[in-house]
């Protein structure tokens, strides 16, 4: 150690003497600049070497410049006040034109005020706190990256892996606190909670660190973001590994405050950090950088070059360029005029006449430095790329990059457009080794195995205990909770990728009665008395304002059930009810129309339709009506009469078969129709209705306009059946409102006399309740989907939603035993086409007959009767034909 210090001092003296002699021999203008640093630290060693190498390299490359920087070192002694004293001394006694440094953000906070008062630019290469930016001092320039820039890559990593909670761990000073406002805003953008902030004192003992780590161990959150100095981080992670916080399941993310100084951390501490992700300042490769690194390794093989050294190198170069461009005129300080009053030492410094001009030239300096593009934008450098590293064994491994505009990518030349929207984290980053040498991505949240069990509230029900039932074991006096909701929850817990310990706590009073309604039960989660609620808890918007629900594990809604009545009155005229009166009337008219038409076509040449008028009238009726039951004895001979009879036979066949089927249905089947068809009819009539006690339905009914006096609560299915069977006239209700799962259970027991007629309210279903922001919500919701898509869900439904009355259908396959239907009479519209067809045949037959009848030539008419389709006599035997012709002639003569 003493050898390194001696070597360091020799180098400083060497560079100082070299530059001083060069300035004197060449007649150059010497310009004093100050460096405020912690001389006895490793950082200071690297920084001072880089500053002097920068001066040497710059003037060697630019021997024509008229100015030469002379470095004056002020030792801050690792103290805020020491930094202020060193700066005052440099300005007052050395009249430095600018100050490089200081090292920490706290020291820079004081120096900014000094630089503002004296107009001396302060150029820092290591103060990264965003708080310094808020001071808005034009004389403070940051030749480094502000910490808030790395918030975006941190946000991208957390979003990529889907972690829902993050605990920041930061040092208790300006450096640690500065990043928090930006970090909080960034995490809120992606709905990530910060349940706790772990603040570590800068001089914390190992015991104090252990106490804080134990707090973190007992939290469910497993994602931690560490923002502190490298020396404190080394002790922190050694303790974390000792206490078991570097095991599988944990996630640690380090900011560049630690990663950039990883080479300064001892090997034991780096081994303890294995599996940690880190944000590292990206230094682009360049030929100048490679040459500088090679020269550094040859000159100082035992000293590790840091990014702060590169920034100090570039800051010194920028200062040399700016001083040369600003010129050498008016480099004095104006003294404060003594008016006889006491003047503070800060006021006694005077004002730099060179400072404003130097500041303007510094803001315009732009060049390609060792650390990348050097250009001040709003007083600081602007990064566009950060490197993502994974600590493995005793070193770091690059696993990707964060690029502004592209996000996380494996390679710098990779474009965001080349990554699919359905990509996984492996498309954005290379392989990661997590703490405990785990390969799978940690969930980021876990119930502490050494912590307490989850306190899960369950409702105390008196009815519909198939869903949730709370009993006491008479032997052990322990609480036994069963039911569909409980079994489904336990199946979901088994699907989680981690163990969850829990206990069911009934929501009841000391006397065993329920302690309130479901709103009261849900509110207990908001108050922190329960960690969750499991049961038949409906997902409602007003409840979601203070708790989080999982995905529904069973569909729900509110159904209206009413009593069913048989609309068919079984009396002595029941046989008339299958057909409507219109169809009856149309059928009778059709009978007479067909009979009369056949008579008109046949009576002149068919003896079966001739005779006395009374005989002919009876024949017409007999022929028309007998076709319903058997073929009539009368034969028809004309073509059109036969066509009409065929059409009529087909109509009668269809009509009689339909009548028979409808009458059989009326005589053998009991068709139940609801007494009420909708909720609006209940409101219009002012009927009394029932609802489930302790449910949200009461509020919904009041919103729809039901007065409190018309609402009757019930608890059990038996109470609901009693109220509906009594009816409103006997103190009962006209209808009852139940949620669909309860309704299925009710109809599985009382299916023969009740029916659901409407679903007036839609709700999401039953869900499990957790506190707002609980990471369990996402995991449990995914597990619900797994169970719902597996045969286990159907097994649970069959086990609990089973019929209790053997005559009832299965409530799973047929939840509504009386599906909606309209028992209607057969009407004319069902046979309209057939009736129209028969009518058309009648019209055509009568038209043809009229045409033949109106023929003037009787002989021609008789010939036509014999030869035309009006007669089918050609088909008759000759003897029979002669008899018919003689009869026709006789009849014609009588006309």
Swiss-Prot record:
Topological domain spans for side Cytoplasmic: 604-610, 632-635, 852-895
Disulfide bonding pattern of the chain: none
Membrane topology: Multi-pass membrane protein
GO term, biological process aspect, one: cellular response to amino acid stimulus
Subcellular location: Membrane
Tissue expression as described in the entry: Expressed predominantly in roots.
Position of the signal peptide: 1-23
Glycosylated sites: 52, 203, 266, 330, 342, 477, 542
Role played: Glutamate-gated receptor that probably acts as a non-selective cation channel. May be involved in light-signal transduction and calcium homeostasis via the regulation of calcium influx into cells.
Protein name in UniProt: Glutamate receptor 2.3
Protein species of origin: Arabidopsis thaliana
């Amino acid at each position: 150690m003493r050898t390194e210090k001696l070597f360091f001092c020799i180098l400083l003296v060497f560079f100082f003497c070299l530059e001083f002699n060069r300035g004197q021999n060449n007649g150059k203008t010497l310009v004093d600049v100050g460096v405020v640093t912690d001389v006895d630290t490793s950082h200071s060693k690297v920084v001072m070497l880089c500053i002097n190498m920068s001066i040497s390299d710059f003037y060697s490359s630019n021997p024509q410049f008229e100015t030469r920087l002379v470095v004056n070192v002020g030792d801050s002694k690792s103290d805020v006040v020491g930094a202020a004293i060193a700066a005052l001394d440099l300005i007052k006694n050395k009249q430095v034109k600018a100050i490089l440094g200081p090292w920490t953000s706290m020291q820079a906070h004081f120096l900014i005020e000094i630089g503002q008062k004296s107009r001396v630019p302060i150029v820092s290469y290591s103060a990264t706190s965003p708080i310094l930016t808020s001071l808005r001092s034009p004389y403070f320039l940051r030749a480094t990256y502000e910490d808030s820039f790395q918030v975006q890559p941190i946000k991208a990593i957390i979003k990529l892996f889907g972690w829902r909670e993050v605990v920041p761990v930061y040092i208790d000073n300006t450096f640690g606190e500065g990043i928090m406002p930006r970090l909080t805003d960034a995490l809120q953008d992606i709905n990530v909670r910060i349940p706790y902030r772990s603040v570590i004192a800068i001089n914390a003992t190992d015991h104090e660190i252990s106490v804080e780590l134990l707090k973190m161990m007992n939290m469910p959150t497993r994602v931690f973001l560490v923002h502190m100095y490298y020396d404190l981080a080394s002790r922190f992670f050694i303790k974390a590994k000792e206490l078991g916080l570097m095991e599988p399941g944990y996630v640690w993310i380090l900011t560049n405050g630690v990663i950039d100084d990883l080479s300064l951390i001892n090997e034991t501490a780096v081994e303890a950090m294995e599996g940690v992700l880190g944000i590292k300042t990206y230094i682009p490769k360049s030929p100048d950088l490679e040459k500088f690194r090679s020269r550094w390794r040859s000159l100082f093989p035992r000293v590790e070059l840091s990014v702060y050294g590169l920034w100090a190198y570039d800051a010194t170069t920028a200062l040399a360029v700016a001083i040369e461009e600003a010129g050498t005129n008016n480099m004095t300080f104006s003294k404060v005029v003594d008016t006889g009053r006491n003047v503070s030492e800060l006021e006694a410094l005077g004002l730099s006449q060179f400072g404003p001009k130097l500041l303007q030239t510094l803001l315009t300096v732009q060049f390609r430095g060792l650390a990348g593009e050097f250009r001040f934008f709003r007083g600081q450098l602007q990064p566009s790329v950060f490197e993502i590293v994974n600590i493995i064994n005793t070193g770091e491994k690059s696993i990707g990059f964060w690029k502004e505009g592209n996000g996380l990518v494996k390679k710098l030349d990779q474009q965001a457009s080349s990554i699919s929207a359905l990509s996984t984290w492996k498309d954005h980053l290379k392989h990661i080794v997590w703490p405990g040498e785990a390969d799978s991505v940690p969930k980021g949240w876990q119930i502490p195995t050494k912590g307490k069990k989850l306190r899960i509230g369950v409702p105390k029900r008196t009815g519909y205990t198939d869903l949730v039932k709370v009993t006491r074991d008479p032997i052990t006096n322990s609480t036994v909770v069963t039911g569909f909701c409980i079994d489904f929850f336990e199946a979901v817990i088994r699907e989680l990728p981690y163990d969850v310990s829990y206990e069911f706590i009934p929501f009841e009073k000391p006397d065993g009665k329920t302690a309130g309604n479901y709103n009261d039960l849900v509110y207990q989660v908001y108050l922190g008395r329960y960690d969750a609620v499991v049961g038949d808890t409906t997902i409602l918007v007003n409840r979601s304002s203070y708790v989080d629900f999982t995905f529904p594990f069973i569909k729900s809604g509110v159904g209206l059930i009413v009593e069913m009545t048989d609309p068919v009155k079984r009396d002595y005229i029941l046989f008339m009810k299958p057909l409507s009166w219109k169809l009856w009337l149309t059928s009778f008219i059709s009978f007479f129309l067909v009979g009369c038409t056949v008579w008109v076509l046949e009576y002149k040449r068919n003896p079966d339709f001739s005779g006395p008028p009374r005989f002919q009238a009876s024949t017409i009726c007999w022929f028309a009506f007998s076709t319903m039951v058997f073929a009539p004895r009368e034969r028809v001979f004309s073509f059109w009469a036969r066509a009409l009879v065929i059409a009529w036979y087909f109509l009668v066949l269809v009509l009689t078969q339909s009548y028979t089927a409808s009458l059989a249905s009326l005589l053998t089947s009991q068709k139940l129709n609801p007494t009420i068809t909708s909720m609006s009819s209940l409101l219009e009539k002012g009927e009394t209705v029932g609802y489930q006690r302790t449910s949200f339905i009461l509020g919904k009914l009041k919103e729809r306009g039901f007065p409190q006096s018309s609402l009757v609560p019930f608890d059990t299915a038996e109470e609901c059946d009693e109220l509906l069977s009594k009816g409103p006239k006997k103190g009962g209700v006209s209808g009852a409102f139940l949620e669909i799962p309860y309704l299925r259970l009710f109809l599985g027991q009382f299916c023969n006399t009740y029916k659901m007629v409407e679903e007036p309210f839609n709700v999401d279903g039953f869900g499990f309740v957790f506190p707002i922001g609980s990471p369990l919500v996402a995991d449990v919701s995914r597990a619900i989907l797994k169970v719902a898509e597996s045969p286990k869900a159907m097994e649970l439904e069959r086990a609990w939603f089973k019929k209790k009355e053997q005559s009832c259908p299965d409530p799973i396959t047929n939840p509504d035993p009386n599906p909606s239907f309209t028992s209607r009479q057969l009407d004319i519209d069902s046979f309209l086409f057939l009736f129209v067809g028969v009518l058309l045949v009648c019209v055509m037959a009568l038209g043809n007959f009229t045409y033949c009848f109106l023929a003037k030539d009787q002989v021609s008419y008789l010939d036509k009767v014999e030869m035309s389709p009006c007669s089918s006599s050609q088909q008759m035997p000759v003897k029979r034909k002669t008899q018919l012709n003689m009869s026709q002639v006789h009849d014609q003569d009588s006309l």
